[in-house]
Structures are given as structure tokens and as C-alpha cells.
């Protein structure tokens, strides 16, 4: 995947990471895949006086992933990569969708729709 994202970034593709995992984990991982921190859409925790609160800001999961993409990305994605049904709405926005190591439900949908399915070794 690192080689793929390196090639995409090198050819001028704008890379984004969209996840329902917390933003500090996704930002760290995204850096390894050539995704700038400003192009990470992930769960944010509200911070008050330097302390994390119990309030979450923007939780991009299911349809909220698609909503965040429509709101924050300058254009709809050419390609989308996902591994679960929580990614379905996001994958439906992409011109080309890829199911990467998908769970059973997403793999079934991907095959029905003719999307690429990839199971890494």
C-alpha cells in the first residue's frame, strides 16, 4: 500500500485518509502513506484547557464519512478504499471503489457491484 500511495502522490493525486478511528492514530499512520495531516478526516476529541473531554467532534463513520467528504474535500474522490460496511457510503462516492481485505458483507456488495476486491497476503 505504501508503494501505491507513493506512486499516486508522485503522479499528482490528492490523498486523503478518512477513518472512524481517533485522529492522532490516523495522522501518524497517514504520514507513512504520504497523506498530509490537513487531509485526514478522523474522530477528534474535544480538548478544554489542555485536557481531553468526553466529547467527540466529528465521528466519520457510515453515512457521516460521505458527509464529511462532501463537506471538506474540494471534489469527489477518483478512488476509494475501504474494508467494512462502515465504508460503503464513502465508497459509493468514488469513481472507482476498492474493497481491501473486506469483511464478508462488504465483499458481497463489492462483488455485486463489480468493484475490485483485494486480499493482501
Predicted feature locations:
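C-terminal cap/substrate-recognition subdomain and adjoining C-terminal extension
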Residues: 1-121
Amino acid at each position: 500500500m505504501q508503494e501505491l500511495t507513493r506512486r499516486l502522490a508522485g503522479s499528482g493525486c490528492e490523498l486523503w485518509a478518512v477513518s472512524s478511528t481517533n485522529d492522532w492514530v490516523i495522522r501518524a499512520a497517514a504520514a507513512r502513506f504520504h497523506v498530509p495531516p490537513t487531509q485526514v478526516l478522523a474522530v477528534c476529541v474535544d480538548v478544554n484547557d489542555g485536557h481531553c473531554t468526553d466529547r467527540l467532534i466529528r465521528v466519520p463513520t457510515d453515512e457521516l464519512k460521505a458527509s464529511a467528504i462532501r463537506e471538506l474535500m474540494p471534489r469527489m474522490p477518483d478512488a476509494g478504499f475501504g474494508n467494512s460496511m462502515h465504508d460503503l457510503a464513502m465508497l459509493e462516492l468514488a469513481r472507482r471503489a476498492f474493497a481491501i481485505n473486506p469483511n464478508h458483507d462488504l465483499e458481497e456488495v463489492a462483488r455485486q457491484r463489480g468493484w475490485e476486491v483485494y486480499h493482501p497476503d
